[in-house]
């Protein structure tokens, strides 16, 4: 959504880490004080995760939409701030002592051989798809990404729309972090360090453009699946994490080059359509064309 609006969010990895540590700390504290109320501890951790996601999204959204700072600079700065808070809270240590219900059911549980975490992700994906494809807000996001000046003339409330976009991005990132925390069984201060690279790569491979105005939830999911399969394949080949980052970096460069060529083809097709329309109008009005030639 942020890329479609013509922006960036380089703070997703730091958001994941901060949410993981924050939610795990609250969850472990509530569960330690009342071991018989695991569900209450999980709900407290979830509420903390969503609150952190909203806070991160507001920080990015206000900087981009109301302070008019470049999204790259804003999210790079907030990533540093979020990571600093993460290390300050955790002191660089993981947070354990989470409820077994959270770790074994949400983190590694299965329903019909499908991970529960995947099933919990489906409603969010469906909601995002409907929001982008069928709502007025989604049309506003595409309009802003395509041509911000035209969107402003059309009456789109650009600052508010961008603020909502970054808040939604922050909340979805926090939700993903909550599920990942269940998966790794602890709050991790370095969780999601590779997310900025992976998320941008997946989005571009899925059809999003760095210039904004293009892409969708379905394509982003396909791109994410491709990146995940690629990562799993490299794990099976026993490639180290450093080698994986190098390969993923090359994949991102290739994806950006393909996006540039796709944009060029789009402009060429648009120009061809304009020429076709103009030539058709000229053929339909030969008298006017002749009159213009005589005047010249």
Where in the sequence are the language-model features?
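Cytosolic-side transmembrane-helix boundaries in multi-pass membrane proteins
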Residues: 153, 157-160, 234-296
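Alpha-helical transmembrane segments in inner-membrane proteins
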Residues: 61, 75-100, 128, 167-185, ...
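Membrane-interface helix caps of multi-pass small-molecule transporters
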Residues: 1, 25, 30, 54-67, ...
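Single transmembrane alpha-helix segments in multi-pass membrane proteins
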Residues: 1-35, 62-69, 207-217, 250
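Transmembrane alpha-helical segments in multi-pass inner-membrane proteins
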Residues: 173, 183-249
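Helix-loop-helix "hairpin" substructures at the membrane interface of multi-pass membrane proteins
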Residues: 41-49, 55-60, 64, 113-188
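Alpha-helical transmembrane segments within multi-pass membrane transporters and channels
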Residues: 31-79, 222-223
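Extracellular/periplasmic helix-loop junction at the C-terminal end of a transmembrane helix
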Residues: 82-110, 149, 185-186, 241-242, ...
